[in-house]
Design a protein with these regions (language model features):
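Conserved thiamine diphosphate
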Residues: 67-103
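Active-site diphosphate/adenylate-binding microenvironment
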Residues: 1-59, 64
Length: 103
């Protein structure tokens, strides 16, 4: 049974702490998430300017985590966006950058 976006967003709303930072790629899922999730603090939502940049979210999430190591970071993206930046996974491992990635 596939996971429905509304279920994913509800789960994220229930478990994410108020200081969580969320990064997003382009795409329908991420557009829906901008309305469905809570952003409690300034600088909590990181998106490409016009939601037209695929592959932004994962690398952005790594940067956010480096800038704010104590904040939980969740990166939302589709399979295409992750495929475009999967090479950054080795960067995250090599430097111990721990984020949550939802593809």
């Amino acid at each position: 049974m596939p996971l429905q976006p509304s279920g994913l967003f509800k789960t994220l709303r229930d478990v994410l702490p108020r200081d969580a930072a969320i990064t997003m790629d382009a795409g329908t899922l991420c557009l829906q998430a901008t309305d469905a999730l809570n952003y409690w603090q300034p600088k909590s939502l990181f998106t490409p300017l016009d939601f037209g940049l695929v592959g932004f979210s994962f690398a952005c999430g790594l940067g956010v985590k480096l800038a704010a190591p104590d904040r939980p970071v969740v990166s939302l993206m589709g399979d295409g966006g992750f495929g475009m930046t999967v090479s950054e996974l080795s960067t995250a491992v090599d430097h111990g950058i721990n984020t949550v990635t939802v593809v």
